[in-house]
Amino acid sequence: MSAHGTNEGALWGGRFESGPAAAMAALSKSTHFDWVLAPYDVRASQAHARVLHKAGLLGDEDLATMLDGLGRLAADVASGDFIPSESDEDVHGALERGLIDRVGPDVGGRLRAGRSRNDQVATLFRMWLRDAVRRVAEGVLDIVDALATQAAAHPSAVMPGKTHLQAAQPVLLAHHLLAHTHPLLRDVQRLRDFDVRAAVSPYGSGALAGSSLGLDPEAIAAELAFDSSAENSIDATSSRDFAAEAAFVLAMIGVDLSRMAEEVILWSTPEFGYITLADAWSTGSSIMPQKKNPDVSELTRGKSGRLIGNLTGLLATLKAQPLAYNRDLQEDKEPVFDSVAQLELLLPAITGLVATLEFHTDRMAELAPAGFTLATDIAEWLVRQGVPFRVAHEAAGACVRVAEARGAGLEDLTDEELAGVDPALTPDVREVLTVEGSIASRNARGGTAGIRVAEQLGGVRQLSESLREWCR
């Protein structure tokens, strides 16, 4: 069985007489996914070098040499001139090798003092995630803005609101579109809240027990744009609840987008006929020439399942791990990396889809009163006349039976038919027996009346802009 040298490409050795077996090395290897942390690793190493210098563990000349070498290494990583070798176990070992190649083993070998891969990777993961969630948040806000723009373009268009996918009450199309913005805005707020907890640096925690070399965790935390350093070194190196929290919010974004995607799929069918998809955001069939498929929406549904799976897998990895660090945590990054990558693919496509939707408002208006959607308006009109709601509810239901029996809408009932159901149903009830009257009457905060929807639109735009400030 072939073996590596005891320290080739790795940050450990010495007590071993031989390196790991080839299969063991392959199992341990993580450069194929953790290389995305390389720019953060170099930044953290630059900060660590300054902390070592401040503690008297690195002389002025060595500090200058090390920072110069790290700067050159950072440039080579960015350009692709420096990449991991086959023998490198992980991003940390690869970069130490790169530094030693540039400044020699005497200076390069000093950087490892006072830090462990345990506190190092926990810090880098947080740094990467804090940047990643801001990118995701901006993509989510692009969708919010596209929905708001469509809402503003259709201020008076009406449609049938549904519960249980059955006709319920008429609403404004703008009201419905804005209903999708609020969960997405909350998702961005969750990312912002997550960032508060992620902004705690594990650096200086060592393997688990902290440092004995007089290093300053607060100094390195400040340089790396953290709000503070960790209060407990064992917790800092072994906990990944920050990763699980991020994975949850990313999955929740997927769920919220999947719900919207499902409506796009339904609305684009001939049976609904509410929308036409732009050619740029549709695909065809290899055999059926007439097809125009809502693939963006279907892929959104599919990827939401993938995001949920990433969260579930991560939680399963984290359960039952005793304190402190365990190698299981090598499995913590790929699910989160993948969730971010999937959303970065998905969000621009959904933005383009939403921005180019063509709404058939005449079709929506035609269906708005169908299915007796004005029945609740009859009941509530009776309540305003002093009729108890239980009685009013039964009277409105009786009106539905009469209309259904003769294949008419509620608005088509005669004065005699209305009075025959309940004498309280005078001709004045007709003020709510129109879609426009029904919508205008729902003018409480949050309702579908035009004035309230305009308020909602303003609030959505204001909150979106405020959240963009955090992203920047």
From Swiss-Prot:
Q: Which GO terms describe its molecular function?
A: argininosuccinate lyase activity
Catalyses which reaction(s): 2-(N(omega)-L-arginino)succinate = fumarate + L-arginine
Where would you find this protein in the cell?
A: Cytoplasm
The protein's matches in InterPro entries, at most eight in alphabetical order, are given as: Arg_succ_lyase_C, Argininosuccinate_lyase, Fumarase/histidase_N, Fumarate_lyase_CS, Fumarate_lyase_fam, Fumarate_lyase_N, L-Aspartase-like
> Which Enzyme Commission numbers does its entry carry?
4.3.2.1
The UniProt entry, under Pfam families, shows:
ASL_C2, Lyase_1
Main localization, broad class: cytoplasm
Q: Which PROSITE patterns match?
A: FUMARATE_LYASES
Q: Name one GO biological process term.
A: arginine biosynthetic process via ornithine
Top EC class per UniProt? lyase
Q: What is this protein called?
A: Argininosuccinate lyase
Species of provenance = Rhodococcus opacus (strain B4)
| Gene that this polypeptide is encoded by | argH
